[in-house]
From Swiss-Prot:
UniProt topology in membrane: Multi-pass membrane protein
GO molecular function terms attached to this record: transferase activity; zinc ion binding
Record-listed Zn(2+) 1 binding positions: C369, C372, C390, C393
Function: E3 ubiquitin-protein ligase component of a retrotranslocation channel required for peroxisome organization by mediating export of the PEX5 receptor from peroxisomes to the cytosol, thereby promoting PEX5 recycling. The retrotranslocation channel is composed of PEX2, PEX10 and PEX12; each subunit contributing transmembrane segments that coassemble into an open channel that specifically allows the passage of PEX5 through the peroxisomal membrane. PEX2 also regulates peroxisome organization by acting as a E3 ubiquitin-protein ligase.
PANTHER family named in the record: PEROXISOME BIOGENESIS FACTOR 2
Keywords, in A-Z order: Membrane, Metal-binding, Peroxisome, Peroxisome biogenesis, Protein transport, Transferase, Transmembrane, Transmembrane helix, Transport, Ubl conjugation pathway, Zinc, Zinc-finger
Enzyme Commission number(s): 2.3.2.36
InterPro entries: PEX2/10 (IPR025654), Pex_N (IPR006845), RING-HC_PEX2 (IPR045859), Znf_C3HC4_RING-type (IPR018957), Znf_RING (IPR001841), Znf_RING/FYVE/PHD (IPR013083), Znf_RING_CS (IPR017907)
Any single GO BP term: peroxisome organization
Pfam families with a match to the protein in the record: Pex2_Pex12, zf-C3HC4
Protein name stated in the entry: Peroxisome biogenesis factor 2
Annotated binding of Zn(2+) 2, by residue: C385, H387, C406, C409
UniProt feature, compositional bias: Pro residues: 27-37
Encoding gene, per UniProt annotation: pex2
Amino acid sequence: MVDNYNNNNILPTNTSTTTTTNTTITPTPPLPPPPPISNILDNNNNNNLIKNDIKNDKVAVSNSNVRPSSSSVSYENSDWNKVYNSEREKLHEVNKQILNIKRPSTSIVRVSQLDSARLDEEILDLLRSQFMKIFTFFKPNFIHNFQPEINLVLKSVIYKLSIFNLGTTYGNQLQNLTYRNEKAFDPIRGSDQLNKLTMRQKWLSGLINIGGEWLWTRINRYLINNNWSEHPPNDIRKKFWNFLNFAESAYKALALLNFLTFLFNGKYVTLVNRILHMRLVYAHPTLSRNISFEYMNRLLVWHGFTEFILFIMPLINIDRIKSFLYRLLVKTSFGNSSGNNNNTASNPLQQLQKQQLLIQQQQMALAKCPICMNDPISMPYSADCGHLFCYYCIKTSCMIDSSFTCPRCNSLISNIKRFSIQD
């Protein structure tokens, strides 16, 4: 009877035998624990295999009290080990298939990348316009002579505070973009992996974009000021001039080719970014892109309102409205003044003083055109009421408004005539 059977396969002693001979039974080598394939193998099959092994060992021990040599089941030839090997091969095949699967590439909206570049340019222009106000009282040619150095300082400051410190520009931050070291990117780890730029990439990008532009501008100015293009073709200066022109044309052609490639795959906006493997990717891939049409709606409303005003303005006679309001105000003031005159009729001295004051004001006013206030009146014309106007003023007012009234006496003007001293 078997009392216990542990993992070390220690054989139990047979208590039913009467033999007094002490035999030493060497235990079989311990089996290593099976690898973790419980998710693949069926538990019932494992239990059946273990029970069969135990029965075979018990039969072998009961027949002979010595260690079995040829009848024992070896570890390499056991059934569960064969199943394990077959399942492991299947897992290796699945792993190879997973590695060979082409992962989806990182797709960045091209419009966002172009908008970020445009925002960076506008930030630079804004700072430049503010910075140029410092040199308002300098010599006129100072800004022209040191324009490359001013741009160098401004771009260096912006580059230090943006890409060098943050790894991205301010325009990229507004578009949820950042630079990624595409050379160190591993596609197997997924497109969400973000490799920061190295110091070498940052320094080279600054030297090429900022220092290279300044050096190129200075060289061109020096060559133009010294007339290197007018030397003979065999002169070394002329050859150097031709080489620079060829280099500039080649750079523009490569930049155009890079831009067309960018429109095709959307990877690198500029040629320098492609050379240095600096690609723009989303800083937060899971961030939702909220699009607000509030500004667009407001712009459309004001645009429609402006078009309506421009359409209706020619149909409105502004001068006629002004004349109507003026007549209304004059009638109101005239009625108030007449009421006051009735109240003050009892005081003849005050009434005489007011009449003299009104005569002086009228004499001063007659020297000016009541419409344009020009002094002296140009080509004076008199109306039905006897007041003088400039010919252009009175003629235009009567053509615009057929019921035009005199601004001085509020009487309707129907005829005008040339004023002369004999009149």
